Amino acid sequence: MDVIEGNTVVSNITKIVVVVARFNKAINNHLLEGTIDTLKRVGQVQDENITIVWVPGAYELPLVSQALSISNKYDAIIVLGTIIRGITEHFEFIYKSCNFGLSNISISNLVPIGLGLLVTNDIGQAVERIGIKGNNKGSEAALAALEMINILKTIKNNN
């Protein structure tokens, strides 16, 4: 029986791009710190192989991710952002558009996208997910991206 699993250590030429929404920057900075720490410490990705792209808000994440994915410069994309429920339906439109767009980009272009997009009801829930109490969703997105790089390489090499 064949079992394909990815590990989280990548080659020294692996290139990762992190796309971060500037809106809710105080929260997203913590996500970014967790992402970078995990890429370097766990994945052993070198500084020169990490690119950070800032975009205005979460709605812009899919467009920039699409442009980066078709550039063929990166082995994975990690997106970071925070969408906090407001009093309007704008919240649902934004998070559904982001998730749908990012999913399509990953599937269509065969580029792993580590999803570090927080969707919360309030600021307290967002703070719980940025690592102050032990878990950082940016770090989790980085781990998923690293593992997916290796899984896709294994599949490609087995064909």
Curated annotation (Swiss-Prot):
Keywords: Riboflavin biosynthesis, Transferase. GO terms for biological process: riboflavin biosynthetic process. InterPro entries: LS (IPR034964), LS/RS (IPR002180), LS/RS_sf (IPR036467). It comes from the Bacteria. The active site is at H90. Coiled coil: none annotated. (2S)-2-hydroxy-3-oxobutyl phosphate binds at R129. Pathway: Cofactor biosynthesis; riboflavin biosynthesis; riboflavin from 2-hydroxy-3-oxobutyl phosphate and 5-amino-6-(D-ribitylamino)uracil: step 1/2. Forms an icosahedral capsid composed of 60 subunits, arranged as a dodecamer of pentamers. Catalyzes the formation of 6,7-dimethyl-8-ribityllumazine by condensation of 5-amino-6-(D-ribitylamino)uracil with 3,4-dihydroxy-2-butanone 4-phosphate. This is the penultimate step in the biosynthesis of riboflavin. Belongs to the DMRL synthase family. This is 6,7-dimethyl-8-ribityllumazine synthase. It comes from Blochmanniella floridana.
